[in-house]
Amino acid sequence: MQMADLEKKLENSVLPPLLKRELSEKILKEEISEEYLVDEIISETIRAYERTLVEPGEAVGVVAAQSIGEPGTQMTMRTFHYAGVAELNVTLGLPRMIEIVDARKEPSTPTMTIYLNDEFKGDREKASMVAKNIESTDVESVSEDISVDLINECITIVLNMHQLESRGLTVADVIESIKSKMKLKIEDHENVLNLKIKTPSLKALRKRLPKVRAIHLKGVQNIKRVIIRKEVDEYILYSEGSNIKEVFDIEGVDTTKTTTNNIVEIQDVLGIEAARNAIIYEMDATLGNQGLTVDKRHLMMVADLMCTDGVVKPIGRHGIGGEKASVLARAAFEETVKHLYSASMRGYVDELGGVVENIIVGKPIAMGTGCIDVCIDKKYEEGKEL
C-alpha cells in the first residue's frame, strides 16, 4: 500500500487534512498491506471522528464556560512562583488567568523566553553576549552613588568600574549618553562625574536627580534583567520585562521561537492570529501548572471570541460582555439600570435573537430542540397519502 493509494481512499472523507496525513503515516509505519484491513481502519477512524463532533444545537459556550470555570475554582491564589528559574518571579494560578481573559495591556510580571540562533545557542559566552545586549542598563545600575553635592553645586555620580566593564561600557559611553539626554556640563574625574547646570539651586538639582538615574545607556528598554539557563543542549534566556519588537532586532535571537507573556504586545507586533495562539497557549500553560487539564477546544472558543473583531478584547463589561447587540443581554450581565435606562431613552428594540434575552422573557431558546421548527399540515388526515 503506497501513500498515493491511501490519499485516494481518504480523498472524499470527512476527516480534516492533518488527521488524514497522520492516519496514512500510521498505516504505512505499521506496514498494513491488506486492503480490507485498511478499509476497516479508515471506516472506524471516520466513525470515531464523527462521534467527537458537536451535536447540532449544542450550547458550546456554556460547556466551555463550565469546563474552564470549574477547574478555575481549584486554582491557587499564589501570585508569584519560581517557574524553574531561581531568580525570576512569574505570576501563575488564578491571578494569571484573570490577566489573560481581562486582556491586560501590561501583565503584573511581564517576561520573555528568548531562544537563540544555531550559532549562539550552544556557546555559553555567545549566549552571555546576547544577554548583555538585551539587558537594559541605566546610569543607576552602573553607579555606586548618585547624589547632590551642595558644596560644589552639582550632581555627583560615582561609577562602579567593575559593573561598567561587565556590561561592556566605558566612562566615555556614560558621558555621551548623559549629554545626549540632558544639557549639562560634565567634569570627568576618572570614576567620578560632576554634572553642573547653568543656574544651580538645590531645587533644580533635586529635580534632575531621578532623570539622571534613569538615563538609558545600553540594551532594550523595559528589560530589567536577563537570566541564562541551559536546557538539554541549548542555552535559553529568560527576561524580567518584555519588549518583543526591540528584542527581535538583537543579533543572535531566534525570532521564530522567542515568545512573551504579554498578549497585547504580541498582537501589536505579530498580529491577531499570533495573539489568539498566545491566549490559548497561556491559558493551557496556566491550567497545566496547577495540574488541571482542560480540552483545548474550550480554550480555543474563548480565544476566538476575544479576537473575533481583529483586536484582543477582554471578557467583561468593558469588552465582549458590554458590546452585545441585545439590550437585555447587556443588562443581564452587569450595570443593569444603566443599560435599560440608556435603551429606553434611545428607543432601542430587542429582537430577542439570543439565549439570555429569551430566558428573561420566558420564550424557548434557539438551542437543542428549540432550534428546530416543527411544521404541521392542518389538512392532513390519518391514513391519507401525503
UniProtKB/Swiss-Prot annotation:
Localisation per UniProt entry: Cytoplasm
Pfam family, one: RNA_pol_Rpb1_5
E.C. designation(s): 2.7.7.6
One Gene Ontology term of the molecular function aspect: DNA-directed RNA polymerase activity
Record has Mitochondrion as a keyword: no
Keywords, comma-separated and alphabetical: Cytoplasm, DNA-binding, DNA-directed RNA polymerase, Nucleotidyltransferase, Transcription, Transferase
Single biological process term from Gene Ontology: DNA-templated transcription
Catalytic activity: RNA(n) + a ribonucleoside 5'-triphosphate = RNA(n+1) + diphosphate
Origin: domain of life: Archaea
GO cellular component: cytoplasm; DNA-directed RNA polymerase complex
Family that this chain belongs to: Belongs to the RNA polymerase beta' chain family.
NCBIfam families, per database record: RNA_pol_rpoA2
Described purpose of this protein according to its UniProt entry: DNA-dependent RNA polymerase (RNAP) catalyzes the transcription of DNA into RNA using the four ribonucleoside triphosphates as substrates. Forms part of the jaw domain.
Subunit architecture: Part of the RNA polymerase complex.
Protein name as it appears in the record: DNA-directed RNA polymerase subunit Rpo1C
Annotated organism of origin: Methanococcus maripaludis (strain C7 / ATCC BAA-1331)
Gene name as annotated: rpo1C
